[in-house]
């Protein structure tokens, strides 16, 4: 997957880069695997903003993804690699031998015509899914479950990869993309390989309008607000923030402040914190 730059016909175009999408083999999605997707604009069920800077963007349809990979013993053939507007990774359309079609997160290197399987003792091959206890130490994995049978929740973004570091009783040690080493139940499933679209991190948005296409709204500086709106607000001209250090809009320290709750139940599963 390459990255394409443009001739500088405008200031926004000068900075912009896009993926070449060489891996994509199919433009239209599988209709049977689509669902409607309504925009939430960062609001919860009470209508209050819980995630700032969200809203607008191009209309999308949700692609139903198989995160569980529970179709054991039935081989599936990769029919297409597709773009998914709802995630940074590409998705693969799988045609199973019994006639069923499913989408999975496409691993890097998976091609049309490849065979993928899931089960207890399938081959250690890119795209195959099996329990962590049956995966050799040192293997690169993604789409990792936290609870057996719930479906993959970890390491699903473009280019992400985790590594199985050790096995210890009912748990395995997984090194996450953040550097954190975590204990995960050995019965949880993971998929072999690294997530596709590894060049995603190198793409430059280039202009404000492209962020708006993605549903990302502007981020206003606190110092540009009034005192009622932000701790940094107010003052004449470019006034200092008036505090020992920068604060969040809610008055909490913005830098160096630990935001993880103390005594969290999952603390015992963290062997080494992220860097």
From Swiss-Prot:
One of its GO terms (molecular function) is rRNA binding. Residues 264-275 have a biased composition (Basic and acidic residues). One of its GO terms (biological process) is cytoplasmic translation. SMART domains: Ribosomal_L2 (SM01383), Ribosomal_L2_C (SM01382). It comes from the Bacteria. Keywords: Ribonucleoprotein, Ribosomal protein, RNA-binding, rRNA-binding. SUPFAM superfamilies: Nucleic acid-binding proteins (SSF50249), Translation proteins SH3-like domain (SSF50104). Residues 224-275 are annotated as: Disordered. GO terms for cellular component: large ribosomal subunit. InterPro entries: NA-bd_OB-fold (IPR012340), Rib_uL2_dom2 (IPR014722), Ribosomal_uL2 (IPR002171), Ribosomal_uL2_bac/org-type (IPR005880), Ribosomal_uL2_C (IPR022669), Ribosomal_uL2_CS (IPR022671), Ribosomal_uL2_dom3 (IPR014726), Ribosomal_uL2_RNA-bd_dom (IPR022666). Disulfide bonds: none annotated. HAMAP family: Ribosomal_uL2_B. Belongs to the universal ribosomal protein uL2 family. This is Large ribosomal subunit protein uL2. It comes from Caldanaerobacter subterraneus subsp. tengcongensis (strain DSM 15242 / JCM 11007 / NBRC 100824 / MB4). The gene is rplB.
């Amino acid at each position: 997957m390459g990255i394409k730059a443009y001739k500088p016909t405008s200031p926004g175009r000068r900075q912009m880069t896009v993926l070449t999408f060489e891996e994509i083999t199919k433009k239209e999605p599988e209709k049977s695997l689509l669902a409607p997707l309504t925009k939430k604009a960062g609001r919860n069920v009470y209508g209050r903003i819980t995630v700032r800077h969200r809203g607008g963007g191009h209309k999308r349809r949700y692609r139903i993804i198989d995160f569980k990979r529970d179709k054991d013993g039935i081989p599936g053939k990769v029919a297409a690699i597709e773009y998914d507007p709802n995630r940074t990774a590409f998705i693969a359309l799988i045609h199973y031998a019994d006639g069923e079609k499913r989408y999975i997160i496409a691993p890097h290197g998976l091609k049309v015509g490849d065979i993928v399987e899931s089960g207890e003792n399938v081959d250690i091959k890119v795209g195959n899914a099996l329990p962590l206890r049956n995966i050799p130490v040192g293997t690169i994995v993604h789409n990792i479950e936290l609870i057996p049978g719930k479906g993959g929740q970890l390491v699903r973004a473009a280019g992400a990869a985790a590594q199985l570091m050790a096995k210890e009783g009912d748990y395995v040690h997984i090194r996450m993309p953040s550097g954190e080493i975590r204990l995960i139940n050995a019965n949880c499933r993971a998929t072999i390989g690294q997530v596709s679209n590894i060049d995603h991190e190198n793409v430059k948005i280039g202009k404000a309008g492209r962020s708006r296409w993605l549903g990302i709204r502007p981020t206003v500086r606190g110092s540009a607000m009034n005192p009622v709106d932000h701790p940094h607000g107010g003052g004449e001209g470019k006034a200092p923030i008036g505090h020992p250090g920068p604060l969040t809009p809610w008055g909490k320290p913005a830098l160096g402040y630990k935001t993880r709750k103390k005594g969290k139940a999952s603390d015992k599963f963290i062997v080494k914190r992220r860097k």
